[in-house]
Amino acid sequence: MEYNRQPCPIRIVEDCGCAFMMGTIGGSLFEFLKGFRNAPTGLQRRLYGGIDLVKMRTPSIAGSFAVWGATFSTVDCALVHYRQREDAWNSILSGAATGGILAARNGIRAMANSALVGCLVLAMIEGAGAAVATINAADKGAGIVIKPQRAQWEAILETIDPKRASSTQDFALAEFERVLDKCRASREPNLLQDIPVKSHERDSKQKPFYSLLDLVKLSQMF
């Protein structure tokens, strides 16, 4: 599931606006360069030629992008509502449906070709996104060494008063041991009630065992 996108009703407006901006920026740049190149000689004429072509062609390009984005998001939201899930298949099917819908005025063959192109393009985009996500996850997970964390106030106390820092650490260990003792005291009677009196398991339960704090002390982590 994609958590960085808006919910479905708002997603249509968002994708339509983003597609319109992409068409405006990309179309303006492309048409300006095209008009600048095809204009007569002279810098001023070339600039005017590029600007005139931008004013004539960019609105239609931006509108086409907006229609494509709105249609794609509408089909995507319909698939999400029908399938009750969000995955790559929704995008692939939405791309195919969008291509077919926008080419419906040109006949069945044009619809099939546009649907195939949209399906292939969205499949490549989803595959590239999945590959990048897998590579990033592998890079982030490699070579990570987990170090024991310390409380922030311990580092501050060490710089101010080392003796107070050690006493604070001992107090924390004592509190931790006290909590463990309470847990053991409340847990052992409940366990022994379910075991028969003359049972080897009951004898083994009554034997002393090391607590978590004892194991930490034996490992000399502190």
Swiss-Prot record:
GO BP term (any one): protein import into mitochondrial matrix
Keywords tagged on the record: Membrane, Mitochondrion, Mitochondrion inner membrane, Protein transport, Translocation, Transmembrane, Transmembrane helix, Transport
Membrane topology designation: Multi-pass membrane protein
Family of the protein in this entry: Belongs to the Tim17/Tim22/Tim23 family.
Function: Essential component of the TIM23 complex, a complex that mediates the translocation of transit peptide-containing proteins across the mitochondrial inner membrane.
Database matches in PANTHER family: AT05822P-RELATED (PTHR10485:SF0), MITOCHONDRIAL IMPORT INNER MEMBRANE TRANSLOCASE SUBUNIT TIM-17 (PTHR10485)
Name under which the protein is recorded: Probable mitochondrial import inner membrane translocase subunit Tim17 3
Organism the protein comes from: Drosophila melanogaster
Upper classification of the organism: Eukaryota, Metazoa, Ecdysozoa, Arthropoda, Hexapoda
